[in-house]
Amino acid sequence: MTKSELIEILARRQAHLKSDDVDLAVKSLLEMMGQALSDGDRIEIRGFGSFSLHYRPPRLGRNPKTGESVALPGKHVPHFKPGKELRERVSSVVPVDMVDAAD
């Protein structure tokens, strides 16, 4: 699901809200979450999961074109940990590629 698909679905489900208001709400939420993470804050949405930053230490990479070794610096990357309710909800879902493989 893309951001625009999410906005469209929410606008249909909440018919009393204007599509522009739903668009603004979703974009504002995502902007605030991005800002919180860039400030080093952790975001927890009970039952859904939490967003935090994980540190990736410096490592030796390789340039795929030349094969030359390249030193890559350490960095922080966003990390999502699903909550218990979300894990339980998706545990019964059969992945699409497994359904395709059965055909």
UniProtKB/Swiss-Prot annotation:
**What keywords are annotated for this sequence in UniProt?**
DNA recombination, DNA-binding, Transcription, Transcription regulation, Translation regulation
> Which biological process annotations from GO are given for this protein?
DNA recombination; regulation of DNA-templated transcription; regulation of translation
Return the annotated region ranges for Disordered: 62-81
Q: Known SUPFAM superfamilies for this protein?
A: IHF-like DNA-binding proteins (SSF47729)
Q: Which domain of life is it from?
A: Bacteria
**Cellular component annotations (GO), alphabetically ordered:** chromosome; cytosol
Q: Which CDD domains match?
A: IHF_B (cd13836)
**What GO annotations for molecular function exist for this entry?**
DNA binding; structural constituent of chromatin
In terms of InterPro entries, this protein maps to: Hist_DNA-bd, Histone-like_DNA-bd_CS, IHF-like_DNA-bd_dom_sf, IHF_beta
Pfam families the UniProt entry points to: Bac_DNA_binding
* Function, in words: This protein is one of the two subunits of integration host factor, a specific DNA-binding protein that functions in genetic recombination as well as in transcriptional and translational control.
**Family, as annotated:** Belongs to the bacterial histone-like protein family.
HAMAP family hit by this protein = IHF_beta
Subunit structure of this chain's protein: Heterodimer of an alpha and a beta chain.
Note the NCBIfam families from the entry.
Answer: hip (TIGR00988), PRK00199.1 (NF001222)
Protein name as it appears in the record:
Integration host factor subunit beta
The organism encoding this protein is Xanthomonas campestris pv. campestris (strain ATCC 33913 / DSM 3586 / NCPPB 528 / LMG 568 / P 25)
From the broadest rank down, the organism's phylogenetic lineage runs:
Bacteria, Pseudomonadati, Pseudomonadota, Gammaproteobacteria, Lysobacterales
